[in-house]
Design a protein with these regions (language model features):
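N-terminal signal peptide c-region/cleavage motif recognized by signal peptidases
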Residues: 19-21
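General helical structural elements
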Residues: 12-13, 117
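Acidic, Gly/Ser/Thr-rich repeat motifs that build Ca2+-stabilized beta-propeller blades
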Residues: 25-128
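Bacterial N-terminal signal peptides that target proteins for export
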Residues: 2-12
Length: 128
């Protein structure tokens, strides 16, 4: 019985080595000419990236020519300690942004939903 169990383990191990071998991938890093200070989160929007900076700015960066446009918003994020403007997620023209806000004298994390129109976040709404 021990011989059969040992054989099964050896067979399974050999099978895994043969059919699930590791493949190497080549990765090339490219330094871009976009200047950012403390970038934190990013989200793809077609051929562009929405990038947040911890200090509160949001930029739309074209990934073809690396032009950068500042997105105007009125979301009251505050940079304090490790907090600030954090992650961003987009789906078409809808954007969700997380970050630190001050509420009742204390710092907490909040999520806002907004629409991106003409490089401005509009209809900003606190959802959490």
């Amino acid at each position: 019985m021990k011989i059969i169990n040992s054989f099964k383990k050896t067979f399974l191990f050999t099978f895994c080595l043969l059919f699930f071998s590791a493949h190497t991938h080549s990765i090339t890093l490219e330094k871009t000419p976009v200047s950012l200070n403390n970038p934190w989160g990013m989200s793809w929007a077609d051929d562009q990236l929405l990038i947040t900076q911890k200090s509160g700015e949001i930029f739309l960066v074209n990934t073809n020519d690396y032009t950068k446009i500042k997105i105007d918003h009125k979301i009251p994020f505050v940079q304090h300690g490790q907090g600030g403007l954090l992650d961003i997620v987009s789906d078409k023209n809808i954007v969700w942004v997380t970050g630190s806000i001050k509420k009742n004298g204390k710092y907490t994390t909040a999520i806002y939903r907004a629409e991106l129109k003409n490089n401005i976040l509009i209809n900003e709404k606190l959802i959490y």
